[in-house]
Amino acid sequence: MAAKIRKGDKVIVLTGRDKGRTGEVFEVRPDAGTALVRGINLVKRHQKQTQNQEGGIITKEAPINLSNVAYVGKDGKPTRIGFKIQADGKKVRVAKSSGVEIDG
């Protein structure tokens, strides 16, 4: 499947505990169909102490399914993403709601 959501994209959460919140994608896991979004889906993990790292309870982002996030367009509203092939043969992402090219 083509990468409709990519690293650096601003997304909004559609369902779940963080519904309506926005954040920036800092990692995409295409094989699992998930992404990590900064400040979204925070969970507490027990960290074992090592020589380099202090032990204790840390808060970090957990993966969120790509079907539960939507790209936020320039107008600040969530939009679906499609693809368009330009005249020079380059494939670019396009916002379905406005038709604006996202990259390229």
UniProtKB/Swiss-Prot annotation:
Alphabetically, the GO molecular function entries are: rRNA binding; structural constituent of ribosome
- Superkingdom in the source lineage: Bacteria
- Which Pfam family is one of this chain's hits? ribosomal_L24
Q: Which Gene3D superfamilies match?
A: 2.30.30.30
**UniProt GO BP:** translation
Which CDD domains does this entry report, sorted A to Z? KOW_RPL26
What keywords were assigned to this record? Answer: Ribonucleoprotein, Ribosomal protein, RNA-binding, rRNA-binding
- Gene Ontology cellular-component terms listed: ribonucleoprotein complex; ribosome
- PANTHER family to which the protein is assigned, alphabetical: MITOCHONDRIAL RIBOSOMAL PROTEIN L24
What's this protein's family per the entry? Belongs to the universal ribosomal protein uL24 family.
Q: How does it assemble?
A: Part of the 50S ribosomal subunit.
The task this protein performs is described as: One of two assembly initiator proteins, it binds directly to the 5'-end of the 23S rRNA, where it nucleates assembly of the 50S subunit. One of the proteins that surrounds the polypeptide exit tunnel on the outside of the subunit.
User: What name has this protein been given in UniProt?
Assistant: Large ribosomal subunit protein uL24
What is the protein's species of origin? Bradyrhizobium sp. (strain ORS 278)
